[in-house]
Amino acid sequence: MDRDKILLTPGPLTTTLRTKLAMLKDWGSWDTDFNAVTASVRRSLLDIIHGHDSHVVVPLQGSGTFSVEAAVATLVPHDGHVLVLDNGAYCKRAVRLTQLMGRRCTVLPFDEAAPVSAAALADQLKADASISHVILIHCETGAGVLNPLQEVADVCAAHGKGLIVDAMSSFAALEIDARKVRFDALVAASGKCLEGVPGMGFVFIRKAILEGCAGRSQSLAMDLYDQYIYMEKTTQWRFTPPTHVVVALAEAIAQFEEEGGQPARLARYQRNYSTLITGMARLGFRPFLDPAIQAPIIVTFHAPADSRYEFKRFYASARERGFVLYPGKLTQVETFRVGCIGAIGPREMEQAVHAIAGALQDMGISSAAPAH
């Protein structure tokens, strides 16, 4: 196919032509026009969470995981104790990065097909007063589970614990209001539900704790406190910024606002999700999660029971038809994932279902029903 393939993944995503065209101009990293773009992006990001009074936002080069790691290193003191609420692969990544930077880390495990429990968190905090910070993955895209941010935030606030939220796959699609939800840090990135391109993360940090973060990070480039102070003083990034990514994000945010902001973005993703679920059910596919805990971000489907099914061939066939799927991330059952986000609508989701039907036909599979 001549046109770009549609990415049905949790990021990078399909972007609009306007976003792509924004990257055709070169920018100087110290140029006043570029610094103005950075400032505008930061203001717009704070607008989305209604956070101007309570938080600052610090952009950082790299993937979203860079910013998660930077947030933990900047916020958690060296003698701090982090509790990770674990119900999936991206929770386990948070555990690993916390351990690698030498912070004490405890894991509170949950089933990968269920949201984390605020009640279990409360019990753990009562049992271990040494815990200083809690890490929550808002939308655990390993399976697609939506975790209860408000309830977890309320428990952390009641116990005086710092909350670090990985909102990578929820920010700008699901409502997050800093006036209602108390968190010390919330992390997201350019290439997710804002529909920019990958290459920049950003961390919202509560103003009340900011000064206490000075000198905590053992990294030069990933010290969010130093990054913030330098930006406030100079309007510039400390080190070479991803100029094209920042400008593309500014354009993507403009389109986000034109669409109607977070409520409109969520409504489109929900339509995408409904179209996908209905179409896949016709083919015999069954989603892994109960709809009550499924975020309209990415959907995990059971693999067909048919012995002729093989994901690599299935993926390649769908890709030939213009759609890029995503492998499963679960440990116990064979699955694959289909994203509902990006610059796409129900029409593209219908086309994706048609492509998946063609992939099954290529493999000689008449029904995609799972084994159980």
UniProtKB/Swiss-Prot annotation:
The modification N6-(pyridoxal phosphate)lysine is found at residue 192. This is 2-aminoethylphosphonate--pyruvate transaminase 2. One of its GO terms (biological process) is organic phosphonate catabolic process. The gene is phnW2. Its cofactor is pyridoxal 5'-phosphate. InterPro entries: Aminotrans_V_dom, NH2EtPonate_pyrv_transaminase, PyrdxlP-dep_Trfase, PyrdxlP-dep_Trfase_major, PyrdxlP-dep_Trfase_small, SP_NH2Trfase/AEP_transaminase. It holds the Pfam family Aminotran_5. HAMAP family: PhnW_aminotrans_5. Involved in phosphonate degradation. Homodimer. Keywords: Aminotransferase, Pyridoxal phosphate, Pyruvate, Transferase. Belongs to the class-V pyridoxal-phosphate-dependent aminotransferase family. PhnW subfamily. Coiled coil: none annotated. Its EC number is 2.6.1.37. GO terms for molecular function: 2-aminoethylphosphonate-pyruvate transaminase activity. It comes from Polaromonas sp. (strain JS666 / ATCC BAA-500). It catalyses: (2-aminoethyl)phosphonate + pyruvate = phosphonoacetaldehyde + L-alanine.
